[in-house]
Amino acid sequence: MVPYELYDLALAFKKVKLWQKLMDSQLFAVRHSDGTTGYCCVMGMLGEHCALAVYPGEAGLNSCRKMFIDDPDLDVFDKHELNFSQDCVMVSYQLKGALNKREVAEVNAYMAERALKLRGKNAYPQFERFRPNCYPWRLSDAADQLHLREALEAALDVAAKLQSATPEQLGFTEGTLFERTIPLLEREGDAFRWSALELPAPWQETYVSPFIGDELSLARIGKSKKRSGSWDCSIFLHIKPASDEVEQGADIDELEEAPYFPYLLMIVDDGSGMVLDMEIFRSFDDLDALCQAVVRFVLDAGRPTQILVADDRTQAFFRNIASQLGVKLVRRRELPALDEAKQGLAEHFASSDGVAPARDVEATLELLSDPAIYSDLPDEVLTMLRRGVQAGALPDDIARMVERECSRRGL
């Protein structure tokens, strides 16, 4: 439960409307009582999302920097990953209907205790903990509550000083969050001591390049004559959250832990655009399991002629694996077949019930009903269709044609 003191401070912060004087790029820092540093961002100058976010330490600051990335070439999955890469504690102001049942109960109890009524646009404070690749969650950790309280107190001091000074006079600077100083506030008794803090250098993104440890399977792949086509590959963050508790039927507001967004590895046939395989994994701590999944797929579908990638993370993942498989790894600026497959996946999960549009299913079944197409399908596509047959997902007439062609090729 959020302490009532935080509600008091949040409502006081809302009254001073600091977002009318500071832009979201004009950060200030707070030296917390536990010795850590929080980087504070005031949002709302455009009137769309009024909030105060506290980013803990350099890791938090690095996630804040990502919020300012504006790349028109990012696809829906890239944008989603940026949006959910934040590491911060936030109080924002919402309509009552935007709060969940737990939050409504808490704010109602607070108002009853304080004999208050909240009125006006976006009058209700919402307290959230954002962690990278996780669903925004309730503010329950004592350290997070402390950091937000001290940031709100510092923000009120900033607002008071801006009554008689400009942001520039107080040391606020504009621009990208690199190579500049920002105000640092540190409590001394009942007041804050102000100084300047140099922003630390940004972190460089690093990605892991795992090896396949299963020597026996590598030997089997090396001896196999089964070949596949060119693979377009991408690792990206799923747009749908996952939770073991959700799978058991729990309501999201009642979960003990925040749902997380898993990663997906998508493999697409570069020639046909057919999705050959899709593996899901929770984090990059699961890379051994992902390598094993890749090995199983290569054994099933055949070794590709080449692996095509278009981003640093996927390139790093396949760097050693491609070498072990004896396959050329090629970096391309664009992979149209992969982009189309990812767009289709995004549209599928954007539907309210999570079911692919009926017209897409009908078009696929109509295509597979034509016997003439099977002789031109790559082996890996037939292998994938056979999995659908085994799962009972395809009509009998299509299943017979798939099995007949697989038998003809000795798959």
What does each model-found stretch correspond to?
Residues 1-411:
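Secondary-structure boundary/capping micro-motif
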